[in-house]
Amino acid sequence: MLLLLTLALLGGPTWAGKMYGPGGGKYFSTTEDYDHEITGLRVSVGLLLVKSVQVKLGDSWDVKLGALGGNTQEVTLQPGEYITKVFVAFQAFLRGMVMYTSKDRYFYFGKLDGQISSAYPSQEGQVLVGIYGQYQLLGIKSIGFEWNYPLEEPTTEPPVNLTYSANSPVGR
């Protein structure tokens, strides 16, 4: 418990565990990847339901999560673009989603009808880093979103070498 509190205070991942939808079925979660960001998304929709989701982490697609079937829509994020807010619509299953990005773009998957909820990070500057939820044979029953800060870009500048001379006050 103390470890979780410490991580929260240090700006660790937001694991509030909020799930949208009625729930039930098998659990799923995207792979935890601390070296790559979400760079793309595939969502399969069929029979007015969201069947499955799949995220692209860096250059590789993670496993497809959810039920089989449906028509797949694919979105590729631009370099430096992140998902910053999501709207979801439920009846008995997830019916649709709208994902908003840091570059003022948005993507519709399915239809926004039923009970509509919004999901966004609790801290300014956080972005979508993972998706989790539950699914049954027909589609996704509940969905949740993990938020954290984007990865820092590695610096291209070489480290500064400090040298001290015998005449400098620091070198004495």
From Swiss-Prot:
Highly expressed in pancreatic cancer tissues (at protein levels). Also expressed in the placenta and colon and ovarian cancer tumors. Residues 1-16 form the signal peptide. InterPro entries: Jacalin-like_lectin_dom (IPR001229), Jacalin-like_lectin_dom_sf (IPR036404), PolyBind_ProtTraffic (IPR052321). Gene3D superfamilies: Jacalin-like lectin domain (2.100.10.30). Keywords: Cell membrane, Cytoplasm, Glycoprotein, Lectin, Membrane, Secreted, Signal. N-glycosylated. GO terms for molecular function: carbohydrate binding. Residues 17-149 form the Jacalin-type lectin domain. Glycans are attached at N161. GO terms for cellular component: apicolateral plasma membrane; cytoplasm; extracellular exosome; extracellular region; extracellular space; plasma membrane. GO terms for biological process: cell migration. Belongs to the jacalin lectin family. PANTHER family: OS11G0524900 PROTEIN, ZYMOGEN GRANULE PROTEIN 16 HOMOLOG B. This is Pancreatic adenocarcinoma up-regulated factor. It comes from Homo sapiens.
